A protein has these predicted regions:
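The feature encodes the CheY-like receiver
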Residues: 16, 58-59, 82
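Two-component/phosphorelay signaling modules centered on CheY-like receiver
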Residues: 4, 13-32
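Active-site beta3 strand of CheY-like receiver
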Residues: 46-52
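C-terminal output helix
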Residues: 107-116, 120, 124
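Active-site residues of response regulator receiver
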Residues: 10, 54, 82
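Helix N-cap/capping motif at the beta->alpha junctions
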Residues: 32-41, 62
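Short amphipathic alpha-helix used as the core "switch/output" element in two-component signaling
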Residues: 41, 63-75
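C-terminal output/effector regions of signal-responsive regulators
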Residues: 131-187
Length: 187
């Protein structure tokens, strides 16, 4: 099973330790930061999939930190922890689309672990979608190039039963086209 990197940002060391303990049995490498600035520094160096941030931190609030994460690292899934006193800030962050989930302190370990697992899956699915979209874009470009070089090649003909009619193309011509496409995909 692949190990996923998650980042915990809280100015209270006891909270960081408790969160880290929560994920001991999960396939995560937990990075920690005691400030938003330190968290941003870690994000610059490590591919993080999920950030869990406290809302009430000195220097930069969790909402402001997660807003910066959204802009600089849009693929990272963001979760906020908050005390009841800072619930308004959490709601504003949710409404601005900066966080995936939020939890109040004290949190339920099971629910938090489930949310992080879902967040990692969300990250992985979105990354796979981006990868597949890149492939589709390359294939569309190749189709345009083929259509330019071989007019009509991308148009299909159907028989009366709806089956595609395949024209006879010499094997040498097919081999040449495949070789050209292989060169473009390997580039």
């Amino acid at each position: 099973m692949e190990i996923s990197n998650i980042l915990v940002v809280d100015d209270e060391l006891s909270v960081i330790k408790a969160l880290t303990r929560s994920f001991l049995d999960d396939p995560y490498k937990v990075y920690s930061a005691i400030s938003a600035t330190e968290g941003l520094s870690i994000l610059e160096k490590v591919e993080i999939k999920v950030v869990i941030s406290d809302e009430g931190m000195p220097g930069m609030s969790g909402a402001d930190f997660l807003a910066k994460v959204k802009v600089r690292f849009p693929a990272v899934v963001r979760i906020m922890l908050t005390g009841h006193a800072s619930l308004d800030a959490a709601i504003k962050a949710i409404n601005r689309g900066e966080i995936y989930r939020f939890f109040t302190k004290p949190w339920d370990d099971f629910e938090l672990r489930f949310a992080v697992r879902s967040a990692v899956e969300k990250y992985d699915l979105e990354e796979e979608n981006r990868r597949l979209l890149d492939i589709v874009k390359k294939q569309a470009l190749n189709m345009k190039l083929l259509a330019k070089e071989f007019p009509g090649i991308t148009q299909l003909e159907y028989d009366e039963k709806g089956r595609i009619i395949i024209q006879d193309v010499p094997d040498a011509e097919i081999a040449r086209i495949v070789a050209e496409l292989d060169l473009e995909y390997s580039a």
